[in-house]
Amino acid sequence: LDHNNLTRMPGPLPRSLRELHLDHNQISRVPNNALEGLENLTALYLQHNEIQEVGSSMRGLRSLILLDLSYNHLRRVPDGLPSALEQLYLEHNNVYTVPDSYFRGSPKLLYVRLSHNSLTNSGLASNTFNSSSLLELDLSYNQLQKI
């Protein structure tokens, strides 16, 4: 479903779905129930949309390993990341803060990309990225003065 003119999340979607490609559309939000029942989903591609809000729609995606929300208009990181998540791509948004202990619920997280956002030191707690599993952290092109 990528490279279309979708303005909202399609549905209902097959529960057996493993990958969902909705990139390069015009989707502006992901309603809380939009991904309900997609327990087998391992990869969700939502990059290059107009998404401003995700809400808690990711909570039930217990098999999700990859979430790509890059090139959107998010101001906040998504609520309730799945515990199986390994790759989180949020570059080229307007994210200005990451809550303290935000990544504690995702112990398998290996890659986090938050480059080209609006992050400042006041929007990041000093222990935000303390994770023994993290292999790559990209915070380039933000407004950080220290790490």
UniProtKB/Swiss-Prot annotation:
PROSITE patterns with a match to the protein in the record: LRR
Q: Which residues are glycosylated?
A: N5, N40, N130
Q: Which InterPro entries would you find in this protein's record?
A: Leu-rich_rpt (IPR001611), Leu-rich_rpt_typical-subtyp (IPR003591), LRR_dom_sf (IPR032675), SLRP (IPR050333)
Tell me a GO cellular component: extracellular space
Describe the PTM: Binds keratan sulfate chains.
Enumerate the Pfam families for this protein: LRR_8
Q: Identify the stretches annotated as LRR repeats.
A: 1-15, 16-37, 40-61, 63-84, 85-105, 108-128, 133-147
Signal sequence bounds: none
Alphabetically ordered keywords of this record: Extracellular matrix, Glycoprotein, Leucine-rich repeat, Proteoglycan, Pyrrolidone carboxylic acid, Repeat, Secreted, Sulfation
Mitochondrion listed as a keyword? no
From what superkingdom does this record's organism come? Eukaryota
Q: Where is this chain's protein located in or outside the cell?
A: Secreted, Extracellular space, Extracellular matrix
Which family does the entry's similarity section mention?
Answer: Belongs to the small leucine-rich proteoglycan (SLRP) family. SLRP class II subfamily.
Q: What does this protein do?
A: Affects the rate of fibrils formation. May have a primary role in collagen fibrillogenesis.
Record's subunit section: Binds to type I and type II collagen.
Task: Write the protein's name.
Answer: Fibromodulin
Organism, by scientific name, is Oryctolagus cuniculus
Q: What is the lineage of its organism?
A: Eukaryota, Metazoa, Chordata, Craniata, Vertebrata
